[in-house]
């Protein structure tokens, strides 16, 4: 018992730790530690980062070093500029005075300094490349590992973890959050170290050149550092909240897109948009707060920087006037400190990126670090050489982690001997399926023990345990690959002969061989291209190929028609020979031959025995048998006919939403799913479908925020102009010492110019705040609008768009997560910086040409600057191509991840976690290789643009000396041109670092514009068409031909004609996959017929408004519920109004679910879990029926509406449905003939055509296909 308690305690601790957190905890959520961000760096990554950091440090040192050279050079100029100056020349000036102040001497000196500049530029070219490329390489390698580790961690979690955590958020984290980590730990960190070194080196050189002045300037620096630190802290907190809101929005989007048919059928688009928008609104609100806080900090930083300039020049000029320093010294100190402090400004985007990365990494690393109590990857545990198959449940108590207050099993005791077949029977939700889940160790019991061959299963290796068990569940999940691959999921390394043998045993061989691609046919996402019966048979083949010791059949034949069921049941009977088998079935005809039948009630077994024994006891089993047989003269079980002439083609294409709703709507193409071909087709699709957009088209997306953008641009222009104005003031201060003014005049002028610096600081504070706030707000509004518009456009599309292999849930949620934020990346604060830098350079050039007689030097610099810009353009072009490749390749990995996460229970049962990991890892190979290439491209182009600045220094001062020597320019004007143009060019060079963001934005904007402008053939938002006040319910199909868009060559309906009058009940019968559910989809107007016409009340369905057409009630075979309360799920039946609680309760009573709901602690407020996983199949089905009834529809569509119900529930629900269809037109699809015979009209469909029609008695008299079906049913009973 100690062993059990330890395990259970650990499980409880885990769930409480990983479950719902309190509000307080969320608010105080910390970020990952600085060094913790690099936890996945190996020795090579560390070497790359170390060398990259060393290169960044050298790079950061070279610019302040340049200022040292600049100081010496200034003192070379000063004597030639002001030979009659009475200023005492000290320090560097004394050295320079030893030179002959002649034109030749000046030019020779300047040539030497030009060589220094060129040498420093060459050094920058090398170290800048090493810095950027190595940091990008290290980041690319670490991100590759993080993606794999994160996916591994998800695959390693236990089912209980998914019950209490929103799986929908995981895909957003895999894309958006990992991208943020990549952004934060790559080249921006290299630039961070570069800026820090520039800051440090600047101050060191400042101290060496003039410690007094440096100390004065340094007095302001702690305040600047403090504001940066506070900003980073606040930013991390806001980023966490923003990411959380976006993750919630992403979870909503994934849930909605996964259930798109349910959403469209019930007209839930508006409701889902509001739900999505609510989370976006929260993210926008946090984002705007973040922008305000951040930009107050930036404004304060700039105010402090300019205040330090004012102080520096005021004190510096005093030192020059008192003959303590030369002007060269003051400039060396000033520029060194200036560069140091400006480098703090450049830290801002890098700190922001790293803060964002730390916030994003917190949740990811938390999941990676979560140790599951049931570890499917563990190598620990016993692996017996042989398994006999004796099973025992000893006093087992259990409740689900997400609903701990609801007890499911209350002391279950059950023994199953080796080779025995035990059938579990009982009402829906009594704990039968829970028993099967405990045996697979998907959960551990709260108390008690489950053992195999006398050994507690908790001591057996988890993977080994699951590999000896074969499972076929009520709602089987197939993966979006070929039929053969789906069966291979059952057991790796299985041969083709074994696959064929398994499908023959499962009665699937014939329909597979009739398909064009046979075993290589793609089944679509979640098996969407197959009918329910076909999916079930492939799932059975998958279980059989496993050759399991223990077989668990949870309603394994529920979706099959009579003939298929008989053959498959025989196959299962054969398969369970020599195996221990547990069968759960509602149809008692399938359990009567079991060795032991166990009757469940209230979470315990109340009776055990074989059929005859239990019939004598007249207990639960007897009651169920009598309920089922009463009134079923024809047969007590399931019937529907499958003709031998049935073509596999028509079977398959009834992709029919047999299940229309759970299977999730989005299907993949018929191309093979070999990785290479898939990638190739993806790339071709990109080239065809993504027209590139211009900057103006991207800007147009933000045009509604033009007042914000105008103010933002205006502020950015002012900020850009401040730098050239600074150049004028700076040159004037230098000029003060060139003129022969008296001491008092010089001091007065210096005081005035110093005060101007303070004024510039105040202006900067205001303009930086408004620039950041306006662009930040516009960017957040844009992100919200784009996500909303894209999601709205997705929900507008018709079902055929979702059928396209490019539009799976995974790729759509990936696009939603990344596209809007990518566009914002080019439009928000980055656009502000670009505008500012362009204004900076433009104003500098204009001032130099117009106000200064230095056009020759300006022109030289104007020739050099395009080279810097050219580097940026080349960089952008190259990176744009890489961004497009990355985007598509990561969409492929997103599809794989989504499929694995959504179908996690199936993946775990099949022990195929490692298979999905391998597939995911393979899908990451191309993005990984692209990231490594991109590192070098970015490194080369960045190094070029940076080095060109130094080369421009060399050219500027060499040519400046030439002009000064020939008296064509004054030194003051050389300084003005140099400061205005070169610093502007430096800003332009920095702009090129935004090239990757702009490249990504262009690709994303093209996708966004493409989907927003796409108008579907069947427009769910259309207000056009006739809107009759009342639909009577007359339905007519006239010569309807149809095939699914994904398989244009395979006909489904081939001239279908029938008519059903108002208030009549039409029953569609026929073989699995003959086109019955296609009729339902055409009535819902999910598709338009290829030929022929569908009429509603005598009007062609296309002429009616699409929302009016969809005012139908629908209950499908595998209903999808949303992760919200039971009340909200029922109310979802009618989204055109607010459904009252009384109506919800009434609908629940009619569907025989009220009593169960009322027994729950939270009653109608109980959450049902993702896709209703917290409920049994029967409970889900009854809630789906209540959802349809609350709509009070004129036409009711029932596609196997009672197939998942147990006998007792089915009888009551069938009565409710019979009552519900009074006065309504009903179209019913059912396999059980007991539910068919009372229909007003029975239509037998074969090969997409009506073969027989009439009442039950008329069709029996014809002795045709229907008669054969009845005979088959009679034999079975």
Swiss-Prot record:
Location in or out of the cell: Cell membrane; Apical cell membrane; Cytoplasm
Extracellular side: 66-115, 208-214, 316-329, 731-754, 854, 958-973
EC class of the enzyme, as a word: translocase
Segments on the Cytoplasmic face: 1-42, 137-185, 236-293, 352-709, 776-830, 875-934, 996-1277
Record text on activity regulation: Translocase activity is inhibited by verapamil and is sensitive to energy depletion. C1orf115 regulates drug efflux through modulation of ABCB1 localization and activity.
InterPro entries according to UniProt: AAA+_ATPase, ABC1_TM_dom, ABC1_TM_sf, ABC_transporter-like_ATP-bd, ABC_transporter-like_CS, P-loop_NTPase, Type_1_exporter
Sequence similarity: Belongs to the ABC transporter superfamily. ABCB family. Multidrug resistance exporter (TC 3.A.1.201) subfamily.
Name of this protein: ATP-dependent translocase ABCB1
Residues recorded with modification Phosphoserine: 659
Membrane-crossing residue ranges in chain numbering: 43-65, 116-136, 186-207, 215-235, 294-315, 330-351, 710-730, 755-775, 831-853, 855-874, 935-957, 974-995
Subunit structure: Interacts with PSMB5. Finds in a complex with ABCB1, TFPI2 and PPP2R3C; leading to the dephosphorylation of ABCB1.
UniProt keyword annotations, A-Z: ATP-binding, Cell membrane, Cytoplasm, Glycoprotein, Lipid transport, Membrane, Nucleotide-binding, Phosphoprotein, Repeat, Translocase, Transmembrane, Transmembrane helix, Transport
Pfam families reported for this sequence: ABC_membrane (PF00664), ABC_tran (PF00005)
Biased composition (Polar residues): 640-652
Modified residues (Phosphotyrosine): 641
UniProt keyword annotation of S-adenosyl-L-methionine present: no
Domain ABC transmembrane type-1: residue ranges: 49-356, 709-1000
Classification via Gene3D superfamilies: ABC transporter type 1, transmembrane domain, P-loop containing nucleotide triphosphate hydrolases
UniProt binding sites for ATP 1: 426-433
Role summary: Translocates phospholipids and drugs across the membrane. Catalyzes the flop of phospholipids from the cytoplasmic to the exoplasmic leaflet of the apical membrane. Participates mainly to the flop of phosphatidylcholine, phosphatidylethanolamine, beta-D-glucosylceramides and sphingomyelins. Energy-dependent efflux pump responsible for decreased drug accumulation in multidrug-resistant cells.
The organism's place on the tree of life at top rank: Eukaryota
GO cellular component: apical plasma membrane; external side of apical plasma membrane; Golgi membrane; intercellular canaliculus
EC number(s) on file: 7.6.2.2, 7.6.2.1
Region listing for Disordered, in residue ranges: 633-660
Molecular function, one GO term: ATP hydrolysis activity
């Amino acid at each position: 018992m100690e062993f059990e308690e330890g395990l259970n305690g650990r499980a409880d601790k885990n769930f409480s730790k990983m479950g719902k957190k309190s509000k307080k905890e969320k608010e105080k959520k910390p970020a990952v530690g600085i060094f913790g961000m690099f936890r996945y760096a190996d020795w090579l990554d560390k070497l790359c980062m170390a060398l990259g950091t060393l290169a960044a440090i050298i790079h950061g040192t070279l610019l302040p070093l340049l200022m040292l050279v600049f100081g010496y050079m200034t003192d070379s100029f000063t004597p030639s500029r002001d030979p009659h100056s009475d200023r005492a020349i000290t320090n560097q000036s004394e050295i320079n005075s030893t030179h002959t102040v002649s034109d030749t001497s000046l030019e020779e000196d300047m040539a030497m300094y030009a060589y220094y500049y060129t040498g420093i530029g060459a050094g920058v070219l090398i170290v800048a490349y090493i810095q950027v490329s190595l940091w990008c390489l290290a980041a690319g390698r670490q991100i590759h590992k993080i993606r794999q580790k994160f996916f591994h961690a998800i695959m390693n979690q236990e089912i209980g973890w998914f019950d209490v955590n929103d799986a929908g958020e995981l895909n957003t984290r895999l894309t958006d959050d990992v991208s943020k980590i990549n952004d934060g730990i790559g080249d921006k960190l290299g630039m961070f170290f570069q800026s820090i070194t520039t800051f440090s080196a600047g101050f060191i050189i400042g101290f060496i050149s003039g410690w007094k002045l440096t100390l004065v300037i340094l007095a302001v620096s702690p305040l600047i550092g403090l504001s940066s630190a506070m900003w980073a802290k606040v930013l991390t907190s806001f980023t966490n909240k923003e990411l959380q809101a976006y993750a919630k929005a992403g979870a909503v989007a994934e849930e909605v897109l996964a259930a798109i048919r349910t959403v469209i059928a019930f007209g839930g688009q508006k409701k889902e948009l509001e739900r999505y928008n609510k989370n976006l609104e929260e993210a926008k609100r946090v984002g705007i707060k973040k922008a305000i806080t951040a930009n107050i900090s930036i404004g304060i930083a700039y105010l402090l920087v300019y205040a330090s300039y004012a102080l520096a020049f005021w004190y510096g000029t005093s030192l020059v006037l008192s003959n303590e320093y030369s002007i060269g010294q003051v400039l060396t100190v000033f520029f060194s400190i200036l560069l140091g402090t400006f480098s703090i400004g450049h830290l801002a985007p890098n700190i922001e990126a790293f803060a964002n990365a730390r916030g994003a990494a917190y949740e990811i690393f938390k999941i990676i670090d979560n140790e599951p109590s049931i570890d499917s990857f563990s190598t620990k545990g016993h692996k017996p050489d042989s398994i006999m198959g004796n099973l025992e449940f000893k006093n087992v108590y259990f409740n689900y982690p997400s609903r701990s207050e609801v007890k499911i099993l209350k002391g279950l005791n059950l023994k199953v001997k080796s080779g025995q077949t035990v059938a579990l029977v009982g009402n829906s939700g009594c704990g039968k399926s829970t028993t099967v889940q405990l045996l697979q160790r998907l959960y551990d019991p709260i108390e008690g023990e489950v053992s195999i061959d006398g050994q507690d299963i908790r001591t057996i290796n988890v993977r080994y345990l699951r590999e000896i068990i074969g499972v076929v569940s009520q709602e089987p999940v197939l993966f979006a690959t070929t039929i053969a691959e789906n069966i291979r999921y059952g057991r790796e390394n299985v041969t083709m002969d074994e696959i064929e043998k398994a499908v023959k045993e499962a009665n699937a061989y014939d329909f597979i061989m009739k398909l064009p691609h046979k075993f290589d046919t793609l089944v679509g996402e979640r098996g969407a291209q197959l009918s329910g019966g076909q999916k079930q048979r492939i799932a059975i083949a998958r279980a059989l190929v496993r050759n399991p010791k223990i077989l668990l059949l949870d309603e394994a034949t529920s979706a099959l028609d009579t003939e298929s069921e008989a053959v498959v049941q025989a196959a299962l009977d054969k398969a369970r020979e020599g195996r221990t088998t547990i069968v759960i079935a509602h149809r008692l005809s399938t359990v009567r031959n079991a060795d032991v039948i166990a009757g469940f009630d209230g979470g315990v077994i109340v009776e055990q025995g074989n059929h005859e024994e239990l019939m004598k006891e007249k207990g639960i089993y007897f009651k169920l048998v009598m309920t089922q047989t009463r009134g079923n003269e024809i047969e007590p079980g399931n019937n529907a006919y499958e003709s031998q002439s049935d073509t596999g083609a028509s079977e398959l294409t009834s992709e029919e939403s047999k299940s229309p709703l759970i299977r999730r709507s989005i299907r993949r193409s018929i191309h093979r799913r070999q990785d290479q071909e898939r990638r190739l087709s993806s790339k071709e699709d990109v080239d065809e479908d993504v027209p590139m957009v211009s900057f103006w088209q991207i800007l147009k997306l933000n045009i509604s925020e033009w007042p914000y953008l105008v103010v933002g641009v205006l502020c950015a222009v002012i900020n850009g102009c401040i730098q050239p104005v600074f150049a004028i003031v700076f040159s004037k201060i230098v000029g003060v010492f060139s003129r022969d003014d008296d001491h008092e005049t010089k001091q007065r002028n210096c005081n005035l110019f110093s005060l101007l610096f303070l004024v510039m600081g105040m202006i900067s504070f205001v303009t930086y705040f408004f620039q950041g706030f306006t662009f930040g707000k516009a960017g957040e509004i844009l992100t919200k609008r784009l996500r909303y518009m894209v999601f709205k456009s997705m929900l507008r599309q018709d079902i055929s768009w979702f059928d396209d292999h490019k539009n799976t849930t995974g790729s759509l949620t990936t696009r939603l997560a990344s596209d809007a934020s990518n566009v914002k990346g080019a439009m928000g604060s980055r656009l502000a910086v670009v505008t500012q830098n362009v204004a900076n350079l433009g104003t500098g050039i204009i001032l130099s040409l117009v106000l200064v007689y230095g056009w020759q030097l300006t022109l030289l610099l104007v020739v050099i600057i395009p080279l810097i810009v050219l580097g940026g353009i080349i960089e952008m072009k190259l990176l744009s191509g890489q961004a497009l490749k990355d985007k598509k390749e990561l969409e492929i990995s997103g599809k794989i991840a989504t499929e694995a996460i959504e179908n996690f229970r199936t993946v775990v049962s099949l022990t195929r976690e490692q298979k999905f990991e391998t597939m995911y890892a393979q899908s990451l190979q191309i993005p990984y290789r692209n990231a490594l290439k991109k590192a070098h491209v970015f490194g080369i182009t960045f190094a070029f643009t940076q080095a060109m600045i130094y080369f421009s220094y060399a050219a500027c001062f060499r040519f400046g000396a030439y002009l000064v020597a020939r008296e064509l320019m004054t030194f003051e004007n050389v300084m003005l041109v140099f400061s205005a143009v070169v610093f502007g060019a430096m800003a332009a060079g920095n702009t090129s670092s935004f090239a990757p963001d702009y490249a990504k934005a262009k690709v994303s904007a093209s996708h966004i514009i493409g989907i927003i402008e796409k108008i579907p053939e069947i427009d769910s938002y259309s207000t056009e068409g006739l809107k009759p006040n009342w639909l009577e319910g007359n339905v007519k199909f006239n010569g309807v031909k149809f095939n699914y868009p994904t398989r244009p060559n395979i006909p489904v309906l081939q001239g279908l004609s029938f008519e059903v009058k108002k208030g009549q009940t039409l029953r569609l019968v026929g073989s699995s996959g003959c086109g019955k559910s296609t009729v339902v989809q055409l009535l819902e107007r999910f598709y338009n017929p290829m030929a022929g016409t569908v009429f509603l009340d005598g009007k062609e369905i296309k002429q009616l408004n699409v929302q009016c057409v969809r005012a139908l009630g629908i209950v499908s075979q595998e209903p999808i519920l949303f992760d919200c309360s039971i009340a909200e799920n029922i109310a979802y039946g009618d989204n055109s109004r607010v459904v009252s609680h009384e109506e919800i309760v009434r609908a629940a009573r009619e569907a025989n679910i009220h009593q169960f709901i009322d027994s729950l602690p939270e009653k109608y407020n109980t959450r049902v879990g993702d896709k209703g996983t917290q409920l049994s199949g029967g409970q889900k089905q009854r809630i789906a029926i209540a959802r349809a009834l609350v709509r009070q529809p004129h036409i009711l569509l029932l596609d196997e509406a009672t197939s998942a119900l147990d006998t007792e529930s089915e009888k009551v629900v069938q009565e409710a449905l019979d009552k519900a269809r009074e006065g309504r037109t009903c179209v019913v699809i059912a396999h059980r003939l007991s539910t068919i015979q009372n229909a007003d009209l029975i239509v037998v469909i074969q090969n997409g055509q009506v073969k027989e029609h009439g009442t039950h008695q008329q069709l029996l008299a014809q002795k045709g296909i229907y008669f054969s079906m009845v005979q088959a049913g009679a034999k079975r009973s």
